Amino acid sequence: MPVITLPNGSKREFSNPITVLDVAADIGPGLAKATLAGIVDGKEVDAGFTIEQDAALSIVTEKSPEGLEVIRHSTAHLLAQAVKSLFPEAQVTIGPVIDDGFYYDFAYSRAFTPEDLAAIEKKMTELSEQDIPVSRRVLPRDEAVAFFRGIGEDYKAEIIESIPANEDLSLYKQGDFEDLCRGPHVPSTGKLKYFKLMKVAGAYWRGDAKNEMLQRIYGTAWANKKDLKAYLHRLEEAEKRDHRKLGKKFDLFHLQEEAPGMVFWHPKGWSVYTAIEQYMRKVQRENGYKEIKTPQVVDRSLWERSGHWDKFRDGMFTVESESRDYAVKPMNCPCHIQVFNQGLKSYRDLPLRFAEFGSCHRNEASGTLQGIMRVRAFTQDDGHIFCAEDAIQSEVSIFTDLLYEVYRDFGFEDVIIRLSTRPEQRVGSEEVWDKSEKALADALNAKGLAFEYLPGEGAFYGPKIEFSLKDCIGRVWQCGTIQVDFSMPARLDAQFVAEDGSRQVPVMLHRAILGSFERFIGILIENYEGAFPPWLAPEQVVVMNITDNQAEYAEKVRNSLQNEGFRVVSDLRNEKIGFKIREHTIQKVPYLLVVGDQEMENNSVAVRTREGKDLGTYSVDDFATLLADSVAKRGRA
C-alpha cells in the first residue's frame, strides 16, 4: 500500500502499486491530461512508471522546470522517427537536448536539402497528430547491441558497445521506431505540438575529424505556441543584430582567412575598444588595482609548473627558438604570480590587486570560431587579487560592487549569478573548500543578491561565481567571474609573511568583469544594434553644412568640439542636407548638427538626434554642455 507524498506535503494512500499517471488522475483529470513525466524520490521517471512503495512524487507538466527538457528530448526522437519514415536508409546516431532546442545526427548518402527539412517537419506534425503511445523496455547491453545491429543501425550499436557489459539499457518505442535513451519521455507523441526545424549542419561522428561526416538537424521545441512564437521572434531579432553584419555595415572590424579568429579593428571599431579600455583603466585604478603588463611569449617551463602544459597543451600556440620551447600565453595568471613573487610580501601588503589588459591566444578549433564572439586572439580585463583566506568574503564583496557599477554603466541591469561548488577532482582540504564556498555565498547574501548553486561545477582549484548579462532581447551572456584558487600560488611558490612571522601561501582570486574585450564589444553591438550610447559611439557628432558657404564654419565647430575631447567628424560634401542626414542617421551617429547661414551668423548649431528628434538651435558652448551631460550618463537611462 504505497503512500505518496506530494510537493505540498499532502499524502495519498493507494491499495496497490500505481503509476505516476494514475496518481495524477486521482488528483484530477486536468492534471492527468497535462502530465508529461514524474519525479519519484528525486529521480525523473516516465508517466507510466509504477510506484511500488512509499515515495515522494512531483508531477512534471509543461509548467515544471523539467518539463521543457522532456518535451525537447522527446521531440528529438520524433525527428528521428520522421527521418526514418521518409529516408529508411538513413542511420540514427545521437540526439541530445541543447539550449533552446535539440539536434539529431544522421548518416545518409546525400545532403539533406531545405525541401527535405520541410518534408521532415511535415511528417513530424503528422506523427504528432496520430498521438502514438510511447513505451519503454529494458535490455541487457549485448541484447541491445544485437537488436540495433539486426535493424542496420550500426552507429547506435557502436555507441552501446562502449557501455559496460553489465549494464541494462532502456529503449523507447513509438510506432515502428525504437531508440536508445535514458528518458524520461512524454506518454505519447500528441504532447509534442510546438516545434520547428531550424537548419542542417555537418558534424563528425563522435566529434572526431578523422571519422565520417554526419548531418546534424537542429530544431527547437516549446511547451506552447506563444513561447515558440516568441523564440522565433528573438531569432529574427538576433539575425538583424548579428554583430558580423553590423560590424561590416558600420565599418567597425573585419576578419579574414589569413588570420582566423583574429580581429582586424577599423578606426571606428578601435575607437569603441579604446573607449572601453580607458574606462576600465579608470574604474580599476579608482578601486585599488595596480596595472601591470606581462610577456606574450613564455618558456614552457613556467606552463609546466603552473599545470597548463599538461591540462591545456592542445589549446596553446607554441614556438621553438634556440632549442627552447615557448608558448604564446593563453591566460595571464602564471605571469601575474611572477610579478607578485618579486620581493617578499608581508600581510600588510595584502590584499594586492593586479590588473592587466592581457592579450591572450588560444588555439580554438576553427569550427567553433564565431565572429568576434569566439576568437583565437583576445584581450581580457584580467585581474588577480592576492589575499589571505579570511579576506575572501570582503574581496568578493568589493569586486561585486565594482562589477555591478560597470554593468550599469554599459546599460545592463539584469544580472544572473551562479555559484559553482567543489568538483569530484579537486585540490585543497575539505575545510578550506567549506570556508571558501561559504565566503562566496556570504558575500552574495550580504548584498541581497539572488544566485543559484551549480554543484560540482567549480574549477579543480576552487569555487567560483559567474555573472551573466541578459540583453535587450532576452539572451544570456556569461561575462564576469571571480574564482578562488588554492593551487597555482603554491605551485609557483607565492608566499607572504604572516602576522605571526610564518611564511604562508596567499589565496589568488581570478577575476574579470567584461571577460574578453572582443566578445563584450560583440555583445554591445548586438544589444544596441549598432546605436552605441554617446559615450561609446565611435563618432559622437557629425557637423553638416547646407552649402559651401558654411564649410569653413562647420570645420570651426568640429574643431571646437574636438578640442573639448569629443569624437566629431564633418560632412562637407556637395550633397543635399536631407541626404546627409539620412546617411548619418543610418550610421547611428548620436547627434547630427546642421549649419546654414543663420547658424553661422549666430555662432550656433541646429541639433538633431539619430532617432529623428529635432532639439532646436543651440550655441556651440551649450551644445558642448548637452553632449558632456549625455556622455556622463554612460549607458544609464
Swiss-Prot record:
It is an enzyme of class 6 (ligase). Its EC number is 6.1.1.3. This is Threonine--tRNA ligase. GO terms for biological process: threonyl-tRNA aminoacylation. Belongs to the class-II aminoacyl-tRNA synthetase family. Its main location: cytoplasm. CDD domains: TGS_ThrRS (cd01667), ThrRS_anticodon (cd00860), ThrRS_core (cd00771). GO terms for molecular function: ATP binding; metal ion binding; threonine-tRNA ligase activity; tRNA binding. Homodimer. It is found in: Cytoplasm. Coiled coil: none annotated. Its cofactor is Zn(2+). Keywords: Aminoacyl-tRNA synthetase, ATP-binding, Cytoplasm, Ligase, Metal-binding, Nucleotide-binding, Protein biosynthesis, RNA-binding, tRNA-binding, Zinc. It comes from Teredinibacter turnerae (strain ATCC 39867 / T7901). Residues 1-61 form the TGS domain. NCBIfam families: thrS (TIGR00418). It comes from the Bacteria. GO terms for cellular component: cytosol.
